[in-house]
Structure formats: structure tokens, C-alpha cells
């Protein structure tokens, strides 16, 4: 997993509350287990019309929001069924940071496990962020837990364990591999039959 230290990017805004995992990526696209290739299906039923043409009224399709790597959204983001495909779709689309009023617990953990930083921020602060010019680079500094724009500086908090994993780019496999020697020693001591 790529370490997350400081991220600079533009933001896309989708301030709906209670966006569930089926809205993030509909179930018909969940037939694969690779982590890539899901970005084109992100918010599929909102982004495209019945002819698979981009819906010009959907915020992510706005020309000045293309290429955004920060998503600012509403409360209870990622609710619904627990499918890791939802964070995969967000990451594959290019998002590294999701700022919401709150997240479903499993979705929050799945974001972290896939190298994305989910930030909980109150509505007043998110509304200030939303007013940032679409072309402006927003800086997200994980080490100092700060989001900076040209006019504002916002503090956020993150649990120490998740912060260390993201900062050092550690997923569950790489954490296990840190104990490879101890695991091998244990396996040598265990009786085999």
C-alpha cells in the first residue's frame, strides 16, 4: 500500500446524506475480485443516463470537477451492505480522501485498508470547504491532521493505529510480514503430525 503523508488535490462535492454502498457501486458490477477497473462504475446510476452517456447534472461530471482526488460528501457515507468493492471503486476513480459527516463503520475500515483517508468533519466545516474554488488544490496533511486551503485551515482527528498504518503504507499483509521471523520460529517449535 502506498504511504499517505500529504495529499494535494482538487475536490468533488456530493453533499447527499446516507449514500449507501449500492449507490457507490451497484451490485451488478461486483462479479470480480480484482481491485481495479471499478472506477468507471462509481455512482453508475447517477453518473450515466440509460444510454450510458454522462449525466451533465451529476456533480462528478462537471468539467471543473474531473480529476478530483478529494470527495466532500454528506452524513453516513458508505452505509448499507458491507462490500469492499465500494472503496475499490472510489480509489480506482482516483479518490484518496473522503470527507463526510460520518461513515458506516465497516466502510470506514475498508477505506483505511485500501489506502484512502476517510475524514469525519462537521457540516459547518464541510460547507466552508465546499466553497473552495473547484480548481484550487486542497492540502491534506495526515501527520499534523490538518486540511489547508488558501483561506481556511481545518483540524481533524484520526485514531493512532489507523494513522500509523496509512502514514507508513501498511496493510494487513505487510504488518504480518514484519513478524515473518517470529512466525517461522513458532512454526519450527510447533509439533507436526
Swiss-Prot record:
Domain of life of the organism encoding this protein: Bacteria
**What is the main EC category here?**
lyase
Q: What does this protein do?
A: Catalyzes the isomerization between 2-isopropylmalate and 3-isopropylmalate, via the formation of 2-isopropylmaleate.
Question: Which GO molecular-function terms appear in the entry?
Answer: 3-isopropylmalate dehydratase activity
Q: Which CDD domains would you find in this protein's record?
A: IPMI_Swivel
Instruction: Please state what the protein is called.
Output: 3-isopropylmalate dehydratase small subunit
> To which species is this protein native?
Bacillus cereus (strain 03BB102)
Protein family per UniProt? Belongs to the LeuD family. LeuD type 1 subfamily.
Q: Which InterPro entries match?
A: 3-IsopropMal_deHydase_ssu, Aconitase/3IPM_dehydase_swvl, AconitaseA/IPMdHydase_ssu_swvl, IPMI_Swivel, LeuD
Q: Which reaction does it catalyse?
A: (2R,3S)-3-isopropylmalate = (2S)-2-isopropylmalate
A GO CC term? 3-isopropylmalate dehydratase complex
In terms of Pfam families, this protein maps to: Aconitase_C
This entry's Enzyme Commission designation comes to 4.2.1.33
